[in-house]
Design a protein with these regions (language model features):
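C-terminal membrane-anchoring or membrane-association module
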Residues: 202-208
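A well-ordered secondary-structure block
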Residues: 12, 61-190, 201
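Short, well-ordered surface patches within globular domains
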Residues: 2-76, 122-129
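Cys/His-clustered metal-coordination modules, chiefly Zn-binding fingers
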Residues: 193
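Extended, regular secondary-structure scaffolds
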Residues: 196-202
Length: 208
């Protein structure tokens, strides 16, 4: 797990850099690169916001996650994604810590921590990916989220009218947006209550 490649051309958006790291390591492993779907990435940002800045809910004995129904009922409308274009989520990474680190380090040190993480990363079930990064209350804690799907490029997770709704604070991939001011992000907004679910320890990847 120590030989990662971070050599691709990316933007100043840390979520784009996270997707670049994922695709570079998939292709180095002889797996196909994934389509960076901004609609799916926006859902990843909404997924983060559902945690309301609570790192303790990401892993450990108090681990929780949003209910699956929230994708169609809350995440998609908040992003302006058509519910009829949602596709199956085939894998997820979620990490949180108090110190901000850049995307390559977040990928290798927080999201890729065990064999299950690698199984998700290299899965042949994925065709699309979307990543999001955000901080809380102008700073710590910081969240990184990646969602994978088996949807069809340019037809799944489509925005109403082809335009995404504003979703600040935070950054998501594929949005052609510069988002380098991680330490200036304002407080994460409140969303619905969680359905309890056991996850892998904080910062680890977790499957469906």
């Amino acid at each position: 797990m120590s030989h990662y490649c971070f050599c691709g051309k990316v933007t100043d958006n840390p979520a784009d850099k996270l997707v670049a790291a994922i695709n570079e390591n998939r292709t180095a492993h002889k797996d196909s690169s994934l389509f960076d779907n901004p609609g799916l990435a926006c859902l990843a940002l909404q997924y983060i916001k559902a945690y309301q800045g609570d790192c303790g809910a990401v892993g450990g004995s108090d681990a929780k996650k949003p209910p699956e129904s929230q994708f169609a009922e809350e995440f998609a409308p908040n992003c302006g994604v058509k519910a009829s274009t949602l596709a199956r989520i085939t894998g997820r990474f979620l990490g949180c810590q108090t110190k901000y680190i850049h995307a390559p380090e977040a990928f290798s040190e927080i999201l890729i921590r065990n064999q299950k993480s690698l199984d998700i990363l290299y899965s042949k079930n994925h065709t699309e990916v979307g990543a999001a990064v955000t901080g809380t209350d102008g700073g710590s804690p910081y969240f990184w989220c990646v969602l994978f799907s088996n949807g069809k490029s340019n037809s799944t997770f489509a925005f109403e009218g082809g335009v995404a709704k504003p979703t600040k604070p935070g950054c998501y991939s594929g949005a052609n947006d510069v988002c380098s001011g991680a330490h200036d992000w304002s407080q994460v907004s409140v969303m619905l209550l969680f359905t309890a679910s056991v996850l892998i320890a904080m910062g680890f990847a977790f499957p469906l």
